[in-house]
Amino acid sequence: GLLGLGYGGYGYGAALAAPAAVSYAAPAIAAAPAVSYAAPAIAAAPAISYAAPAIAAAPAISYAAPAIAAAPAVSYAAPAIAAAPAISYAAAPALRYAAAPAIRYAAPAVARVAPAISYAAVAVARVAPAVSYAAPALSYARYAAPAVSYAAPALSYAAPALSYAAPAIAKYALH
């Protein structure tokens, strides 16, 4: 089932939907059962809450924009892109793609996908097996469960596999 969390009050527009477990609206977000994010306000999920530029940190994750707290697993920096195993990155015009089962992504800047994790952003640099982020373009985030879903002005991320897409991402940290 899809859990829709609309953030139209923040001036965000069209919604993007993923099959089965995840749905997204970029830049606004409708979240799957696991994780949802929205900007610029903050709503806290059972484990984590985020604020930009300030941070409220849960036991596992903290985010800040433009400042970044990096976890031991994954970090990103703009504008170069380096891909870790099972991860692919691409920035440029690609509006929609499907990666892992039951996951669909749509964002202004997405180009290619890897088996388990895929990233796409105008500014992405480094990745590790786990995932974490924080970026100037990431106003607000809410993390909820084992799966993860993100959306900044143009960022979307999904559960069974990981997927990112945003026009401006500086760094991320999640563990």
UniProtKB/Swiss-Prot annotation:
Sequence repeats: 17-20, 25-28, 31-34, 38-41, 44-47, 51-54, 57-60, 64-67, 70-73, 77-80, 83-86, 91-94, 99-102, 106-109, 134-137, 144-147, 151-154, 158-161, 165-168
Name of the featured protein: Cuticle protein 16.5, isoform B
Single GO MF annotation: structural constituent of cuticle
Source organism superkingdom: Eukaryota
Keywords of the record: Cuticle, Repeat
Function, as annotated: Component of the cuticle of migratory locust which contains more than 100 different structural proteins.
UniProt comment concerning the protein's domains: The tetrapeptide (A-A-P-[AV]) repeats found throughout the protein are also present in many proteins constituting the protective envelope of other species.
